[in-house]
Amino acid sequence: MNLLYKSTRNSDKTVTASQAILKGLADDGGLFVPVSVPKLDVTMDELKDMSYQETAYAVMKQFFTDFTEEELKHCINSAYDSKFDTEVIAPLVKVGDTYHLELFHGATIAFKDMALSILPHLMITSARKNQVKNDIVILTATSGDTGKAALAGFADVPGTKIIVFYPKGGVSHVQELQMVTQKGENTSVVAIHGNFDNAQSGVKAIFEDK
């Protein structure tokens, strides 16, 4: 059964997972949420012995039902590969009596690598499924970690381009260096005069100018 997505502001209109990924936000400005929450078809005992990639597939196949097994596994394996400094991807480490899930093993050492590594591959696959032939251009504003993680995730992914806007003097020197030294034929970084709110408002204005 195909799991559909609705807006948090309107339950009448539904879209597929790939359509939601391409749109980002619903037409009414709401967020896309699944019309129902599916149940996993694997047990906790089975999950604990799975690799990160296997776990990702077990979860994602329940939510992205218009993707084939081959498509989903390609996205997952393209995202969670040697860009991470451990094959485990997100190790669960015991320190004393506490367990910690380490989310800093990605390309930029930020937890946002977990999502932004797979997003470009999901978007490209979604575009192909919906007969979108143009390049996907990502415009985003950042005040720190997101910019570098997004640049690293989309760098040299065919069919995509990314432009990151940040406030000059509004990010740390290290964060600025991380962004402006990012390699990739499809990446651009723009410093603006103003603060993060100005950068974010500018990006929103571009999207609203139809």
What residue spans do the PLM features occupy?
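PLP-dependent amino-acid enzyme catalytic core
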Residues: 1-210
